[in-house]
């Protein structure tokens, strides 16, 4: 539709040139987001006017200072509104995104205006915006410097190759010599790691004793792990006999199922690993001070959680009888569906799930007859307060007792247009936001909360 209102401030130009968009929702959408929604909606850029939207102050627009640009609205023969904004004290109105064809766009709609190319500098960025939203800025270009690859500090010539090893890091293969890791050079006279008769020599790292340190898996026959100070590798199933782990101080790796007999974990001070199902008899967790892991279904009899001060894990469905949560002071986990009756979570009584009153939509929506199929009020619902929708309409605002404090003007300018695009958006300053049905409450009286009495 051609006669769509267009109110653009200098900050919106910066937004278009810099392609600054934000997906931060201004208000929580209590309706199905897959429904068709208006392509844009006008709201006031007043912090107090939208603070209570969906009871979510964190989504409120809180500028550091008001924008002072203003101009006078008007219409032409095409029933289009000239680019303008109206400064209403602390309530500066910014608007509006629209679609060329109703329902044809699935991406944020562009303003219906051609803006000539011009350099964008920090001096043009004047509107106050949400602190968490990105603002246009001058980006300094950092020259790309070529990364210099340092050559190897030592190259072992072929004449110096020690039997059993390669200097180039190539893994050993049956019938071939072993390998030296990058940066590692074996001392003269060093030989291969521990061997099992009839097998290929394995790999040894610096600090290991030739002929004593075990080989890597698949090397040395028994598949034991090779260790160096501070590193340990767990045995794989079927390796090293019982499959137990080799450990060094401060490091532990848990046994895998079928290893170490019962499959219990090896623990050292400060570290614990939970048993897997079928390990350790009942499958309960091994715990040490300050650490806990939750039981899995079918473990520990009732499947209850072991808890320590400050930590709690919820029971899984079918555990502990009714599946209620175990709680400790300050922590709660919600019940799962089918638990504790209706399965709703609560921060009320510990150890049981109770129903929570559903928070109604804080916005007083029009009667059902005035709500369109997309969950938004129909345009005719607001005719009484907004006048004819589409072009900008001047509406008289009742005199406020706080007018002397805020310097509010008696006239406001706003407009709304719905073209059934998937996502409604609103432009505030130089950023674009997604909005939900709740934002329509601001249209009925956009500056109700501008005053601080």
UniProtKB/Swiss-Prot annotation:
GO cellular component: polar tube
PTM note: O-mannosylated. O-mannosylation has functional significance for the ability of microsporidia to invade their host cells.
Keywords, comma-separated and alphabetical: Glycoprotein, Repeat, Signal, Sporulation
Signal sequence annotation: 1-22
UniProt subcellular location: Spore polar tube
Compositional bias (Polar residues): 74-87
Superkingdom of this protein's organism: Eukaryota
Stretch list, region 6 X 20 AA approximate tandem repeats: 214-333
Region listing for Disordered, in residue ranges: 61-87
Residue positions the entry lists as glycosylated: 79, 225, 245, 265, 285, 305, 325, 344
Composition bias type Low complexity, residue spans: 63-73
Sequence repeats: 214-233, 234-253, 254-273, 274-293, 294-313, 314-333
Gene Ontology biological process terms, A to Z: sporulation resulting in formation of a cellular spore
Function of the molecule: Involved in formation of a polar tube through which the infectious agent is passed on to the host cell.
UniProt name for this protein: Polar tube protein 1
Organism of this sequence: Encephalitozoon hellem (Microsporidian parasite)
């Amino acid at each position: 539709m051609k006669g769509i209102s267009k109110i653009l401030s200098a900050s919106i130009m910066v937004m278009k040139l810099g392609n600054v968009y934000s997906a931060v929702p201004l208000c929580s959408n209590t309706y199905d987001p897959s429904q068709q929604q208006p392509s844009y909606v006008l709201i006031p850029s007043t912090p107090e006017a939208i603070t209570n939207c969906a009871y979510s102050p964190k989504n409120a627009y809180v500028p550091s200072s008001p924008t002072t640009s203003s101009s006078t609205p008007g219409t032409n023969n095409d029933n289009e509104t000239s680019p303008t904004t109206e400064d209403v004290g602390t309530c500066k109105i910014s608007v509006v995104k629209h679609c060329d064809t109703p329902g044809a766009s699935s991406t944020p709609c562009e303003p219906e205006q051609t803006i000539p190319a011009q350099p964008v500098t920090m001096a043009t960025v004047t509107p106050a915006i949400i602190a968490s939203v990105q603002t246009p800025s001058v980006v300094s270009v950092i020259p790309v410097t070529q990364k210099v690859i340092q050559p190897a500090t030592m190259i072992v010539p072929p004449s110096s190759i020690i039997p059993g090893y390669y200097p180039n890091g190539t893994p050993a293969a049956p019938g071939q010599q072993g390998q030296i890791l990058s940066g590692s050079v074996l001392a003269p006279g060093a030989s291969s790691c521990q061997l099992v008769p009839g097998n290929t020599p394995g790999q040894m790292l610096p600090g290991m004793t030739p002929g004593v340190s075990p080989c890597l898996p698949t090397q040395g026959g028994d598949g034991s792990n090779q260790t160096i100070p501070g590193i340990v590798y767990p045995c794989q199933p079927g390796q090293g006999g019982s499959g137990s782990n080799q450990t060094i101080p401060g490091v532990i790796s848990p046994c895998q199922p079928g290893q170490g007999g019962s499959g219990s974990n090896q623990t050292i001070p400060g570290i614990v690993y939970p048993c897997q199902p079928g390990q350790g008899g009942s499958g309960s967790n091994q715990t040490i001070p300050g650490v806990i892991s939750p039981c899995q279904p079918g473990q520990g009899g009732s499947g209850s959680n072991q808890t320590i001060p400050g930590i709690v894990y919820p029971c899984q469905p079918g555990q502990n009888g009714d599946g209620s949560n175990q709680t400790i002071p300050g922590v709660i986990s919600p019940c799962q569906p089918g638990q504790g009756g209706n399965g709703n979570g609560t921060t009320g009584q510990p150890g049981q799930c109770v129903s929570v009153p559903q928070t109604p939509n804080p916005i007083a929506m029009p009667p059902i007859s005035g709500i369109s199929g997309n969950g938004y009020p129909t345009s005719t619902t607001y005719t009484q307060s907004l006048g004819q929708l589409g072009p900008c309409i001047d509406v008289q605002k009742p005199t406020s007792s706080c007018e002397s404090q805020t310097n509010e003007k008696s006239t406001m300018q706003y407009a709304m247009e719905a073209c059934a695009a998937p996502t409604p958006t609103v432009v505030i300053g130089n950023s674009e936001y997604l909005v939900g049905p709740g934002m329509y409450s601001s249209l009925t009286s956009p500056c109700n909360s501008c005053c601080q009495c």
